[in-house]
Amino acid sequence: MDIVSLTWAALMVVFTFSLSLVVWGRSGL
């Protein structure tokens, strides 16, 4: 695995995590 795909994988993980956090927060937690 090269550095570019590794960076994209980390970016997608952070994006998905923050997005789910926002949705979870708006749900009224």
Swiss-Prot record:
<dbReference type="GO" id="GO:0017004">
    <property type="term" value="P:cytochrome complex assembly"/>
</dbReference>
<dbReference type="Pfam" id="PF03742">
    <property type="entry name" value="PetN"/>
</dbReference>
<dbReference type="InterPro" id="IPR005497">
    <property type="entry name" value="Cytochrome_b6-f_cplx_su8"/>
</dbReference>
<dbReference type="GO" id="GO:0015979">
    <property type="term" value="P:photosynthesis"/>
</dbReference>
<feature type="transmembrane region" description="Helical">
    <location>
        <begin position="3"/>
        <end position="23"/>
    </location>
</feature>
<keyword id="KW-0812">Transmembrane</keyword>
<keyword id="KW-1133">Transmembrane helix</keyword>
<keyword id="KW-0793">Thylakoid</keyword>
<comment type="subunit">
    <text>The 4 large subunits of the cytochrome b6-f complex are cytochrome b6, subunit IV (17 kDa polypeptide, PetD), cytochrome f and the Rieske protein, while the 4 small subunits are PetG, PetL, PetM and PetN. The complex functions as a dimer.</text>
</comment>
<keyword id="KW-0602">Photosynthesis</keyword>
<dbReference type="GO" id="GO:0009535">
    <property type="term" value="C:chloroplast thylakoid membrane"/>
</dbReference>
<keyword id="KW-0249">Electron transport</keyword>
<keyword id="KW-0813">Transport</keyword>
<keyword id="KW-0472">Membrane</keyword>
<dbReference type="GO" id="GO:0045158">
    <property type="term" value="F:electron transporter, transferring electrons within cytochrome b6/f complex of photosystem II activity"/>
</dbReference>
<dbReference type="InterPro" id="IPR036143">
    <property type="entry name" value="Cytochr_b6-f_cplx_su8_sf"/>
</dbReference>
<comment type="function">
    <text>Component of the cytochrome b6-f complex, which mediates electron transfer between photosystem II (PSII) and photosystem I (PSI), cyclic electron flow around PSI, and state transitions.</text>
</comment>
<dbReference type="GO" id="GO:0009512">
    <property type="term" value="C:cytochrome b6f complex"/>
</dbReference>
<comment type="similarity">
    <text>Belongs to the PetN family.</text>
</comment>
<protein>
    <recommendedName>
        <fullName>Cytochrome b6-f complex subunit 8</fullName>
    </recommendedName>
</protein>
<keyword id="KW-0150">Chloroplast</keyword>
<keyword id="KW-0934">Plastid</keyword>
